[in-house]
């Protein structure tokens, strides 16, 4: 059974913990309690292949930003979360993706861009088109989720597994890496 390390990144209050807890336990956290660092494990079957996800739910506040390099160094897949009802959280996600590329020293890191809180449609500040355009620029999948209504939560974690599975395959067009798997 494959084990993967997934890191959930985003500003404070965007719903990183709520998404993670909803996926792992099937419950919604109503009260906001800022995270410093939480670690979860869950078995998941994606495309008939079992995997174990080790999910690191990170602090969104800037005072813990210095810890991000370590999280990123150890992560294999990244879920970048912003709140659809907070334009600033969308802007804040861009330097986080840049930090992933800088630490990993590789452009093709498995990343999913996630607009959370789709259940608050009437308060939306970030359009679907803005999210899609950024994901297209980055060459990664884009999803809109709701931890509260469980919209696309399971699909999100299944997709990051697919992205990590794909990244683990050697590049058939690159003769240097056709016989090895460098991570």
UniProtKB/Swiss-Prot annotation:
Activated by the guanine nucleotide-exchange factors RAPGEF3 and RAPGEF4 in a cAMP-dependent manner. Nucleotide exchange is also specifically stimulated by RAPGEF5, RASGEF1A and RASGEF1B. It is found in: Midbody; Cell projection, Lamellipodium membrane; Golgi apparatus; Recycling endosome membrane. It catalyses: GTP + H2O = GDP + phosphate + H(+). Changing residue 180 to A: Loss of association with membranes. GTP binds at residues 10-17, 57-61, 116-119. A motif (Effector region) lies at residues 32-40. A lipid is attached at residue 180 (S-farnesyl cysteine). One of its GO terms (biological process) is negative regulation of cell migration. Ubiquitinated; undergoes 'Lys-63' monoubiquitination and diubiquitination by NEDD4. Multiple lysine residues are probably modified. Ubiquitination requires TNIK, prevents interaction with effectors and inactivates RAP2A. Ubiquitination by the ECS(RAB40B) complex leads to RAP2A localization to lamellipodia plasma membrane, activation, and regulation of sorting at early endosomes for recycling to the lamellipodia plasma membrane. Palmitoylated. Palmitoylation is required for association with recycling endosome membranes and activation of TNIK. Coiled coil: none annotated. The effector domain mediates the interaction with RUNDC3A. Belongs to the small GTPase superfamily. Ras family. Interacts with PLCE1. Interacts with ARHGAP29, SGSM1, SGSM2 and SGSM3. Interacts (GTP-bound form preferentially) with MAP4K4. Interacts with MINK1. Interacts with cytoskeletal actin. Interacts (GTP-bound form) with RUNDC3A. Interacts (GTP-bound form preferentially) with TNIK (via the CNH domain); the interaction is direct and recruits RAP2A to the E3 ubiquitin ligase NEDD4. Interacts with RGS14; the interaction is GTP-dependent. Transgenic mice expressing a constitutively active form of Rap2a display impaired spatial learning and defective extinction of contextual fear. This is Ras-related protein Rap-2a. It comes from Mus musculus. The lineage of its organism: Eukaryota, Metazoa, Chordata, Craniata, Vertebrata.
